[in-house]
UniProtKB/Swiss-Prot annotation:
It is found in: Nucleus; Chromosome. GO terms for cellular component: nucleosome; nucleus. A motif (SPKK motif 4) lies at residues 19-22. This is Histone H2B.3, sperm. The keyword Glycoprotein does not apply. It comes from the Eukaryota. A motif (SPKK motif 2) lies at residues 9-12. Keywords: Chromosome, DNA-binding, Nucleosome core, Nucleus, Phosphoprotein, Ubl conjugation. The nucleosome is a histone octamer containing two molecules each of H2A, H2B, H3 and H4 assembled in one H3-H4 heterotetramer and two H2A-H2B heterodimers. The octamer wraps approximately 147 bp of DNA. It comes from Echinus esculentus. Contains 4 SPKK motifs which may interact with the minor groove of A/T-rich DNA sites. Phosphorylation of this motif may regulate DNA binding. This motif is reiterated in both termini of histone H1 and in the C-terminus of plant H2A, but its presence in the N-terminus seems to be unique to sea urchin histones H2B. Core component of nucleosome. Nucleosomes wrap and compact DNA into chromatin, limiting DNA accessibility to the cellular machineries which require DNA as a template. Histones thereby play a central role in transcription regulation, DNA repair, DNA replication and chromosomal stability. DNA accessibility is regulated via a complex set of post-translational modifications of histones, also called histone code, and nucleosome remodeling. Monoubiquitination gives a specific tag for epigenetic transcriptional activation and is also prerequisite for histone H3 'Lys-4' and 'Lys-79' methylation. Phosphorylated on SPKK motifs 3 and 4; which may regulate DNA binding. Dephosphorylated during maturation of spermatids to mature sperm and rephosphorylated at fertilization.
């Protein structure tokens, strides 16, 4: 979490990230978290 201080602010986005993380397609919807997750994958 320390890596993205910006995301830490919006707690509502936190739970949303977990959902897209599993589906993969959802990550693209997030855009912010989707881009990093794609690179890791």
């Amino acid at each position: 979490m320390p890596r993205s201080p910006s995301k830490s602010s919006p707690k509502k986005g936190s739970p949303r990230k977990a959902s897209p993380k599993r589906g993969g397609k959802g990550a693209k919807r997030a855009g912010k978290g989707g881009r990093r997750r794609t690179v890791v994958k």
